[in-house]
Each structure stands twice: as C-alpha cells, then as structure tokens.
UniProtKB/Swiss-Prot annotation:
Membrane topology: Multi-pass membrane protein
Keywords in alphabetical order: ATP synthesis, CF(0), Chloroplast, Hydrogen ion transport, Ion transport, Membrane, Plastid, Thylakoid, Transmembrane, Transmembrane helix, Transport
Record protein name field: ATP synthase subunit a, chloroplastic
Gene name per UniProt: atpI
InterPro entries attached to this UniProt entry: ATP_syn_F0_a_bact/chloroplast, ATP_synth_F0_asu, ATP_synth_F0_asu_AS, F0_ATP_A_sf
Length: 248
C-alpha cells in the first residue's frame, strides 16, 4: 500500500509540474476552446492603429505628397523595394501586400510594447504586453510564412516543386523536409526571445532605478525591435523567393 501511495503521489507531483505556466494568462471560453485573450486584445489594438493611420491621413491625396502622405508613401516604397530585392523583378508584386503586412504588424507590435502603457490596464488575470511578446503570435507568423512558402513553390513550379527534396541526393530527403519547417520557426523563436528579453530588462531596470537609467535601454529596445521586424520580413521574402526559384 505504501508503494502504491508513493506512486500516486509521484504522479500527482508530475501532473502539477506539467500544469505550471510562465506568468498568468486571461482566457476566454468559446465553446469547448480557451482563447488567449491578452494576445487578441493587444493584436486588435495594433491592427486598429495600422488601419486607422492610413485611413485618416490619406483622405485627401495630393499629387505632390507632403507630411503624413509622404511618410506613408516612403514606407510603401521601402516594403516594395525590400520584396523586389529578395524575390527579383519577376513575380515579386503579388507578394508585396503579404510581406508588407508581416513587416508592419511585427514592427507596430514590437514598438507597442515600449510605447503603449499596457500594464496600466488591469485584468482579472495576467497583464497586457506586446503581441510578439507571446510565443503563440510568433509561431502563428511562422506558420503563415510556411504556408506562403509552400503555396509560392507549388503555384510557380507545380508538382515539380517536390523534386527539390531529393536534391542533390535522395539521402537528404528527411533533412530537406525538416529544413522547410525549421527556417520559419527559427524566425519565430528569435523574434519572441528578443522582444521578451527586451521587455524583461526594461521592467527590471525600471523597478530598480525608475528614472533616467532605463531610458537608454528603452531607446535600444526600439531600435532592436525595428531590426527584428526587418529581419523577419526580409527572410520571409527570401524564403518565398527561394521556393519559386527552386534552389537553396
């Protein structure tokens, strides 16, 4: 009996360990599913900002752009040039909206973690933070990149696209298959790790020295957040362009 009781206690302890979560989360119950409310709330705010900014500033377009219109056109040209550089002149145009959406959403999400006072809003459980501070968001972006990667290859090359998995030798088939999934996932973990680390460092410094010292770290965080958005969008465009060209 004592041995059985010890085994039951060990199983209970393992169950408690497996149910441990990092931080507290707010969930919405929709049918039989639990939805991560914090990520949805902050993501909706970021999307609303991205939609409202051009909608409110481009109502009266001018042939010679000035002010906000000039800035928005500059951003669009930057995204177009980025996509064209990674994919080439042929076939890059249909992918400009996808790469642009990726870049702008990640950029705005990263900056929202430093500029918006998320923690002022009180929740029953947990606290609000940048959408890219959550691994669910970055993995979802990686999965979208994977879907776009496969779609671009199949649309451009048909079923001959799968021939790349046995190049240069069929022995590399498992590695080539794994590579297609690890490339976008590595982007997601890099983005998640950088944004989470940045917010944790700033939070620790603010708690220790709440005045001048955290400011340089916040400025550095804004810079690295922009760089992370650029890296994700650039590599996503490069992977899609690679799938259409059919070489590694």
């Amino acid at each position: 009996m004592q041995i059985e009781q010890l085994q039951i206690n060990e199983i209970d302890n393992l169950h408690q360990v497996s149910s441990v979560e990092v931080g507290q989360h707010l969930y919405w119950q929709i049918g039989n599913f639990q939805v991560h409310a914090q990520v949805l709330i902050t993501s909706w705010v970021v999307v609303a900002i991205l939609v409202a900014l051009p909608a409110t500033t481009t109502g009266n377009l001018q042939s010679i752009p000035t002010g906000t219109q000039n800035f928005i056109e500059y951003v669009l040209e930057f995204i177009r040039d980025l996509t064209r550089t990674q994919m080439g002149e042929e076939g890059y145009r249909p992918w400009v909206p996808f790469i642009g959406t990726m870049f702008l959403f990640i950029f705005a999400s990263n900056w929202s973690g430093a500029l918006l006072p998320w923690r002022v809003i009180q929740l029953p459980h947990g606290e609000l933070a940048a959408p890219t501070n959550d691994i669910n968001t970055t993995v979802a972006l990686a999965l979208l990149t994977s879907v776009a990667y496969f779609y671009a290859g199949l649309y451009k090359r048909g079923f001959s696209y799968f021939g790349k998995y046995i190049q240069p030798t069929p022995i590399l088939l498992p590695i080539n298959i794994l590579e297609d999934f690890t490339k976008p996932l590595s982007l997601s973990f890099r983005l998640f790790g950088n944004i989470l680390a940045d917010e944790l460092v700033v939070a620790v410094l603010v708690s220790l020295v709440p005045l001048i010292v955290p400011v340089p770290m916040m400025l550095l965080g804004l810079f690295t957040s922009g760089i992370q958005a650029l890296i994700f969008a650039t590599l996503a465009a490069a992977y899609i362009g690679e799938s259409m060209e059919g070489h590694h």
